[in-house]
Amino acid sequence: MSNTKESKQVIVIRKDLNMRKGKIAAQAAHASMGSILQLLDRRKYNLLEGEVMEIRGEIKVSSPECHWLDNSFTKICVSCDTEDELLALVQKAKDKGVLCCTIIDSGKTEFNGVPTLTCAAFGPAWAEDVDEITGNLKLL
């Protein structure tokens, strides 16, 4: 067993919304990209110059974000039952200091025009930190 730390991102999708497969894929992609944009903003990057080589030069080598960018971009999709459950996970991530990006769909193609919280991405962060938040959830 390796002592190397692993990084990952977990995307939690609300299953009570009964979204179509394509909608789920789009929402998960929004969440993953949103977390990267948050990371870039947090690190005060110029997005026009935010190529991976430049990002790697600015993020501490020991950070989970750098590990994630340099490795396999591990993403795992799991589900939760309700909006309240997702919001509780988001609060837990905030309390723990784990990067979290929530997605509120505009409602143009689903949800009868009502903006709706669909999912959240947790991380990239060290796997054990993300697991403390999402480890009990079932795979999507």
Feature names for model-found ranges:
Residues 1-140:
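Positively charged, small/polar-rich N-terminal and surface patches that mediate targeting and assembly
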